[in-house]
C-alpha cells in the first residue's frame, strides 16, 4: 500500500536532485517496474525522450484509489526500515518530480482489479478517472526538459547504455527499447551470457567466464581472464541485491587482490558482479542517485574468496601456501595455454610464437621469472623447511618476530634472532639467509612471501638482450606454458601478449582468416580512420 513517509524519514531522504536527464527518468520508471515484479518492460523514446517517454510493464499495478497518492512527494509502498531496504526505489520522489517537470500520464490495473485507472498530472493539477487497462502499469512523460535545448541523440544514447547496464543485473527480464518507433534493443530475458553480448559485444562476451557461489552471501557474474584487461575499472559493473552501484574501494581492493597473480598492477578485468547480501552486510547512501554503497569486511572477504575459487576452477591461478603449516604439493592442473611453437625472436628480448588461431609475443625475462617463481613455490610446498648446517645469528634494528614464512627461528636476546631452518634452495648460499630474513620483515602474510620468492626468482632469470637459440626459446616457452599462471611475472608485469586471428582480421579490415579459404584473392584496400585501422 502506498502511504506518505513520516517526517523523520523525509528529512533523511530529501537530499539531491532526482532528475538531471532523460536517463534518470527512465531509470526511476524502470526501477518502479522491477519493484512491482515485472517480467516484461517496454520503453519508447520520442525525440530522444524529450518529447515523450513511455515505460510499460506487466507488474502488479497500482490500485485505482492509490494512484493520486503515487504522485505525491515522499509517498511510497516500499520503505519500512532504512536498515532493511529491499527495493530499488524507496524515496517516493520520482513520480512527483516528473509531475513537476512534465505532463504525466499513468494507466494502471492490478491483476485482481476489475477495470483500471488513468491519472493525468501536471504541476499542482491532478485528474483521475476509471479507464480500461491491461494488468500492469504504463507511464507516459510528455515534454520533459522543454525549452532547455538538449541533444536528443545524446539523451537516447544515455538511455540505451542504462538499459544495457540493467540487463547485466536483471538478465531474465524481457526488455525492449524503441527509438522513434524503431526497435533498437530487443532482449528476451535469455540470461547473463546473452546480456553480456548486448552490453560488451559478442567478441568480448566470448572471453568471459562464469562466477557462481551461493549461500547467505551469494555471487553470480562474468569476468575476463588475464587475456583482457583495462587500466580503469570502467567496464567492471557491480550490483548489490539487483541495484546497480558504483564500485566502492573495498570491492576494487578485493578484485585487485584476487587478480594479483593474473593481471599487471593497475589493471582491471571486464565483467559484471552481482552480489546478494543480507541486511547489515552493506550500507547504502540515502541520496538521489542511490548508487553508493559500502560493504562490510565480511562481504569483501567473501567476494575475494569467491573470485579465487572461480579462478582455480578455470585453471587460472592457485593460492600461495599459508606460511605455517606448509600444505602438501598437489598435482598441477592442465596448462592455461595451448601448446605454442616459437618461430622467431625480436631484439634478443622477445619470443614470437603461434598456437591454434593466435600469435603470442613473450618477454623472455618475465617468462623466466615466472618459471623460476613457480619452481621455488613448488619446492617450498614439497620440501618445506630443512635445518641449516649450523644456526645463523642475525642482528636486527627492531624486535624479532615470533615466526617467519621462510625460516625457522628462535629469539637470542634483544634485537637478535637465530635462523635454525630454511628452504633447501637457500642452503647452498650461506650469505643469503640473513639478507632474505631481514627482507622478510617487510610486508605481511602472503604478500610478504610472494615478494620474497619473486626477488629470488628475479636474480638468476634471463635478462633482455640475452641471445637464445631456437631450441632454447622453445624450451623456455614450453616451461612457461606448464606454469599455472603464465600471464604475468611475479611482480605483476605482463609475460605475454595474445593476439587472436579474429583480432588481426578486424584490425586489417579483412572479411575472414587465411584458414577460412573464403576469398580466392585479397579484396582491395579501403580507407580507414585511426579508430578503425
UniProtKB/Swiss-Prot annotation:
Molecular-function annotations in GO: ATP binding; ATP hydrolysis activity; ATP-dependent DNA damage sensor activity; mismatched DNA binding
Chain positions covered by the region annotation Disordered: 510-533
Skewed-composition ranges (Basic and acidic residues): 515-533
Keyword annotations of the record: DNA damage, DNA repair
Keyword field contains DNA damage: yes
GO biological process, alphabetically ordered: mismatch repair
InterPro entries given in the database record: DNA_mismatch_repair_MutL, DNA_mismatch_S5_2-like, HATPase_C_sf, MutL/Mlh/PMS, MutL/Mlh/Pms-like, MutL_C, MutL_C_dimsub, MutL_C_regsub
This protein's GO CC annotations: mismatch repair complex
Protein family: Belongs to the DNA mismatch repair MutL/HexB family.
Summary of the function given for this chain in its UniProt record: This protein is involved in the repair of mismatches in DNA. It is required for dam-dependent methyl-directed DNA mismatch repair. May act as a 'molecular matchmaker', a protein that promotes the formation of a stable complex between two or more DNA-binding proteins in an ATP-dependent manner without itself being part of a final effector complex.
Annotated protein name in UniProt: DNA mismatch repair protein MutL
Gene name for this UniProt entry: mutL
Amino acid at each position: 500500500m502506498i502511504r506518505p513517509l513520516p517526517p523523520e524519514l523525509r528529512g533523511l531522504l530529501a537530499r539531491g536532485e532526482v532528475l538531471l536527464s532523460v536517463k534518470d527518468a527512465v531509470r526511476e520508471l524502470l526501477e518502479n517496474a522491477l519493484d512491482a515484479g515485472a517480467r516484461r518492460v517496454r520503453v519508447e523514446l520520442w525525440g530522444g525522450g524529450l518529447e515523450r517517454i513511455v515505460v510499460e510493464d506487466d507488474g502488479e499495478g497500482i490500485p485505482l484509489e492509490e494512484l493520486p497518492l503515487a504522485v505525491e512527494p515522499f509517498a511510497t509502498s516500499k520503505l519500512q526500515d532504512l536498515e532493511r531496504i529491499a527495493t530499488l526505489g524507496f524515496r517516493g520522489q520520482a513520480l512527483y518530480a516528473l509531475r513537476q517537470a512534465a505532463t504525466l500520464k499513468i494507466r494502471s490495473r492490478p491483476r485482481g482489479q476489475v477495470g483500471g485507472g488513468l491519472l493525468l498530472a501536471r504541476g499542482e493539477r491532478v485528474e483521475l478517472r476509471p479507464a480500461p487497462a491491461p494488468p500492469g502499469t504504463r507511464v507516459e512523460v510528455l515534454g520533459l526538459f522543454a525549452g532547455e535545448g538538449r541533444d536528443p541523440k545524446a539523451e537516447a544514447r544515455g538511455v540505451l547504455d542504462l538499459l544495457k547496464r540493467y540487463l547485466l543485473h536483471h538478465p531474465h527480464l524481457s526488455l525492449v527499447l524503441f527509438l522513434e518507433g524503431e526497435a533498437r534493443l530487443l532482449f528476451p530475458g535469455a540470461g547473463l551470457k546473452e546480456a553480456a553480448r548486448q552490453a560488451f559485444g559478442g567478441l568480448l562476451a566470448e572471453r568471459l567466464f562464469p562466477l557462481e557461489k551461493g549461500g547467505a552471501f551469494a555471487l553470480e557474474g562474468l569476468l575476463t581472464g588475464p587475456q583482457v584487461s583495462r587500466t580503469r575499472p570502467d567496464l567492471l559493473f557491480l550490483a548489490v541485491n539487483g541495484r546497480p552501484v558504483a564500485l566502492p574501494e573495498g570491492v576494487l581492493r578485493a578484485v585487485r587482490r584476487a587478480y594479483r597473480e593474473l593481471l599487471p598492477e593497475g589493471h582491471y578485468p571486464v565483467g559484471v558482479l552481482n552480489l546478494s547480501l543480507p541486511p547489515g552486510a552493506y550500507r547504502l547512501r540515502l541520496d538521489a542517485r542511490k548508487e553508493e554503497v559500502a560493504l562490510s569486511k565480511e562481504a569483501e572477504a567473501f567476494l575475494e574468496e569467491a573470485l579465487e575459487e572461480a579462478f582455480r576452477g578455470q585453471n587460472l591461478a592457485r593460492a600461495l601456501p599459508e606460511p605455517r603449516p606448509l600444505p602438501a604439493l598437489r598435482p598441477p592442473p592442465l596448462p592455461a595455454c595451448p601448446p605454442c611453437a616459437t618461430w622467431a625472436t625480436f631484439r634478443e628480448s622477445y619470443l614470437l610464437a603461434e598456437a591454434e588461431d593466435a600469435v603470442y609475443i613473450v618477454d623472455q625475462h618475465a617468462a623466466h621469472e615466472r618459471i623460476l617463481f613457480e619452481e621455488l613455490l613448488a619446492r617450498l610446498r614439497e620440501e618445506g623447511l630443512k635445518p641449516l648446517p649450523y644456526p645463523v645469528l642475525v642482528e636486527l634494528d627492531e624486535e624479532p618476530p615470533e615466526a617467519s614464512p621462510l625460516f625457522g627461528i628462535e629469539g637470542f636476546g634483544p634485537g637478535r634472532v637465530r635462523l635454525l631452518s630454511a628452504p633447501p634452495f637457500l642452503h647452498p648460499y650461506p650469505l643469503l639467509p640473513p639478507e632474505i630474513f631481514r627482507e622478510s620483515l617487510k610486508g605481511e602474510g602472503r604478500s610478504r612471501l610472494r615478494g620474497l620468492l619473486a626477488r629470488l626468482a628475479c636474480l638468476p632469470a634471463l635478462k633482455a638482450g640475452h641471445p637464445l637459440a631456437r631450441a632454447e626459446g622453445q624450451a623456455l616457452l614450453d616451461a612457461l606454458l606448464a606454469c599455472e599462471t603464465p600471464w604475468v611475472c611475479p611482480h605483476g608485469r605482463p609475460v605475454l601478449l595474445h593476439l587472436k586471428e579474429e583480432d588481426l582480421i578486424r584490425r586489417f579490415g579483412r572479411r575472414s582468416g587465411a584458414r577460412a579459404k573464403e576469398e580466392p584473392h585479397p579484396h582491395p584496400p579501403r580507407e580507414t580512420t585511426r579508430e578503425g585501422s
